[in-house]
Amino acid sequence: MQRKPVLGILGFSDGDPEVHEQLRGIVQAQVDAIVEALQADGRVDVVVAPELVNSVESAKRLSEDLARQGVDATLFSYGVFAFPNFSAIAAQNGKGPFLLAANLNPDWPGMVSMLAAGGALHHLGIEHFRVAGDVKKPEVLEQIVTFARCAKAVSSLNGMKYGLFGGRSLGMYSSTVSMQDWQKLFGIDVDHIDQSEIVREAELVPAEQVEKAYQWLTENVGSVQFNDTTFTPDKLRTQIRHYEAIKKLTKDNGYDFIGVKCHYEMSRHYCTECLSAAFMNDPYDWDGPKEPCALVRPTVTPL
């Protein structure tokens, strides 16, 4: 079962100790409203900082503490005017991406604080997102939930390993992965493996496993339409062997998701990898339930 996104929440207050004491209730009320709305909605787990940011020291300490707790992203909440440098320090030491949130309250300059903090982050080259409005409104809450879900997706990619069987297919630039960009943007390690490994491993698949799969397919799919040339029973058995080989190579190499070039080396001289694409992406095969593994072919970038 997939986990929920985890969103860290950090409230920002005035940097003057006396003013902070006067306004902390307003700032905390804004934080509490966001937390209560997310908890009632149930789609996002929250980790709330135990105190409000009102100094350089607390900005660094509290943002680092949220990051250590494994949040996918951090929401900065503004109920009154907070010194923008606090947000800059928190962003430099916390876990991004960052969502700046303020209510549209004419009595207090939370919106002004959010805009000033956003300007500070822009000056530092720190990309961020903003949401303005009452979190009790569905459209505002939905923006926060969507942000958290996207942040979880990006966070989950960090440290993953992509297995690239073969290289660019059919001359398509737009379907070719840049190893440097994926590592820089997502933290994904791209491991190149030759398609000949599929052929080698396919020859080692036991005949009884091939026949088991063949019988399962012919008995359970809606129709298997053989012909005398491109799709014979033996060709289906070859496709089964290739799927079993890809499944084993994926497990042995610790790949989280994969791509297979296929055209034209595999499709012309051995078989297409369509059956592999179908069952690697499914939560089952002839051996029963299994974890899906994203496979694209030809080697189209799956992101």
PLM regions: where:
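An N-terminal assembly and electron-transfer interface module characteristic of large anaerobic redox
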Residues: 1-303
